[in-house]
């Protein structure tokens, strides 16, 4: 009997199955096809010729053997292999037909995944806070250019998987689960049929009373112990294949639930991180708000909700502002120019930084007074 055609078909299934499916295929080829073809035929080749009965009545042995084994063990197992592999072969044909019609879609999908880029990150310039503090009635730029650091191409994006995602991407998941269900049903059916036909033991002798036997006849079976061991091995192989089918169904179910939860979490994160779009190589920023008194809020100046500068920091800022103001007054008196002095003084970088520091100190003091009033109440 030639098994090459069936073996080649089953090898193709290996390319479109999960890790558990590959294990099932290995068990099927080694412990079923090879074991049945090599061991079964060598053990059962003389099952009818060595089945002898203590009678000389013509046709009695044939009738008694038919009562002993309505279906030969080897033929039963061959039929079992063919019927159990039929859903997998049908799935393979459907998969090859489906994939052959979608080569362009796969190429487009791979190109999209490679060309995906991360969304621009909101960035604020280093001198943005002090520019807002100038109060020079000039519109400050809302976008700033920043070089995007190069990252390793697709580093860490490739996730190891066992074929489940490939089956899902090709649109074969429903058909794959359906053929698993059919395989499991066939396994259960053949296990029950094998138990009904043969039980768990090959008896050494069989009592026959069928016609045309003239009386009750004792018949004897060749190598009953060896056949019993082989029968139990085939029971174990069938149970193992059924267990692998159930494990694969469980694996696909857990993987599908995990993918659904991961997709839901990803959608929630994307909905929370919706940002304004920006031109290429630019990062968009939002205009910072101001307090009711018209003073800007700086992210790094220590003045925010629920935060208050310590007393020694306030004293240090006062001393710093006092010294800076003295330097500016000295420079103002030494400058011989007239009207341009006020303009240059108000627009100098030192004046801008001092104004920012003064705003910072005022906000800290206001925050401290408000907290003390709340604590007094």
Curated annotation (Swiss-Prot):
Positions in the Extracellular compartment: 40-75, 198-228
One example of a Gene Ontology biological process annotation: cell communication
Compositionally biased intervals (Polar residues): 337-362
Chief place of localization: membrane
Stretches that traverse the bilayer: 19-39, 76-96, 175-197, 229-249
Region (Disordered): 129-163, 265-294, 334-377
PROSITE patterns: CONNEXINS_1, CONNEXINS_2
Topology of the protein relative to the lipid bilayer: Multi-pass membrane protein
Subcellular location: Cell membrane; Cell junction, Gap junction
GO cellular component terms given for this protein: connexin complex
Source species, domain of life: Eukaryota
Biased composition (Acidic residues): 131-151
Membrane side Cytoplasmic: residue ranges: 1-18, 97-174, 250-377
Keyword Membrane: yes
Keywords: Cell junction, Cell membrane, Gap junction, Membrane, Transmembrane, Transmembrane helix
Role of this protein: One gap junction consists of a cluster of closely packed pairs of transmembrane channels, the connexons, through which materials of low MW diffuse from one cell to a neighboring cell.
Summary of subunit composition and partner proteins: A connexon is composed of a hexamer of connexins.
Family per record: Belongs to the connexin family. Gamma-type subfamily.
Protein's name in the database: Gap junction gamma-1 protein
Underlying gene: gjc1
């Amino acid at each position: 009997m030639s098994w090459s055609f069936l073996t080649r078909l089953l090898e193709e299934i290996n390319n479109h199955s999960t890790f558990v499916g590959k294990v099932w295929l290995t068990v099927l080829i080694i412990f079923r096809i090879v074991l049945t073809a090599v061991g079964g035929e060598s053990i059962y080749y003389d099952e009818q010729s060595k089945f002898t009965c203590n009678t000389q009545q013509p046709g009695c042995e044939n009738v008694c053997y038919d009562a002993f084994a309505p279906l030969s063990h080897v033929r039963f197992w061959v039929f079992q292999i063919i019927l159990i592999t039929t859903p997998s072969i049908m799935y393979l044909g459907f998969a090859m037909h489906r994939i052959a019609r979608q080569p362009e879609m796969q190429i487009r999908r791979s190109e999209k995944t490679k060309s995906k880029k991360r969304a621009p990150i909101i960035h604020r310039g280093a001198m943005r806070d002090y520019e807002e503090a100038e109060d020079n009635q000039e519109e400050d730029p809302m976008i700033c250019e920043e070089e995007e650091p190069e990252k390793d191409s697709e580093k860490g994006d490739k996730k190891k998987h066992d074929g489940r995602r490939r089956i899902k991407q090709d649109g074969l998941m429903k058909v794959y689960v359906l053929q698993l269900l059919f395989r499991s049903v066939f396994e259960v059916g053949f296990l029950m049929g094998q138990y009904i036909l043969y039980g768990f033991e090959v008896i050494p002798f069989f009592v026959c009373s069928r016609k045309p036997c003239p009386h009750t006849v004792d018949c004897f079976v060749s190598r009953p112990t060896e056949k019993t061991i082989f029968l139990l091995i085939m029971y174990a192989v069938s149970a193992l294949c059924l267990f692998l089918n159930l494990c694969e169904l469980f694996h696909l179910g857990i993987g599908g639930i995990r993918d659904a939860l991961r997709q839901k979490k990803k959608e929630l994160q994307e909905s929370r991180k919706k940002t304004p779009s920006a031109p290429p190589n630019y990062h968009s920023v939002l205009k910072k708000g101001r307090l009711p008194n018209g003073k800007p809020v700086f992210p790094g100046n220590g003045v925010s909700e629920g935060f208050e500068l310590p007393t020694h920091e306030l004293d240090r800022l006062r001393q710093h502002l006092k010294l800076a103001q003295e330097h500016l007054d000295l420079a103002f008196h030494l400058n011989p120019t007239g009207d341009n002095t006020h303009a240059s003084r108000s627009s100098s970088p030192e004046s801008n930084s001092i104004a920012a520091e003064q705003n910072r100190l005022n906000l800290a003091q206001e925050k401290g007074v408000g907290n003390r009033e709340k604590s007094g109440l």
